[in-house]
Amino acid sequence: LLLLTVYQILFMDKVPTSAAVDEAVKIAKRRDGQATANFINAVLRNFMRSEHRNEEPKDWETKYSMPKLLLDKMVRQFGGKRTGEILESLEKPSHVSLRKIDPTVEIAGTRASLLTESALIADSGNFAMTEEFQSGKITIQDETSQLVAPQLDLEGAEEVLDACAAPGGKSTHMAQYLTSGHITALDLYDHKLDLINQNAERQHVEDKITTQKADATMIFEEFGSDKFDRILVDAPCSGIGLIRRKPDIRYRKESSDFVDLQKIQLEILNSASKSLKKSGIIVYSTCTIFDE
């Protein structure tokens, strides 16, 4: 309780300090009685008077709540200056990114993306509840994720494999480029295949996407050689690039994870490449900032 309240005082500004202390005292009294409440109150009041409370943390691990494992990797790969910039950027709130399925759609409170014509940006909002989302005129998809489908240079008639497809954002985006072509979307788990199907139906591209339960490291064994004109390998990775939206990711990583993921990624690429036609294109994408 003390740690949580001190963190709230130091790093969160929506609740006044006096209110944070008062709430902590009430919780302590309710849980452990008046003596504990008096102790909590004394410690927090003393901390508020302390000359140290307004000091900037001297290390990145404390200031940005970033584990040493990830900090060391960042510094090795990017250097100190760039690492500081990355850490600062991760503290900023993430915006909402939409993909236009209907190119004529206009959504109040959004602005055009500078990265891609397909994206609209908003500072906040629950767009999944809008009529435009429900009717399949827009979907929620990160800007950078929307850069992937154009890289496959789809002309309309291709046989496409999305090797690691869930939840289906890139599959449905690729489907927008197809006329007579077709996408086979793979995942290991039934509930994730259901997500792909739901997204495809909402966006009215279910006739262009077939989901299949399969291990992406066994693509060649499943489909044989020279099967696909285009293959997307949106490989499983550490997901460090998603920290702003999923801050808990940073606390669930061990050094062995990066080595294990590299092996899986290579197995997927090796197997997928054997099922690619000789004139085909394979695109490899991840949502991490690290080399691994």
Residue ranges and their predicted role:
Residues L1-E292:
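S-adenosylmethionine
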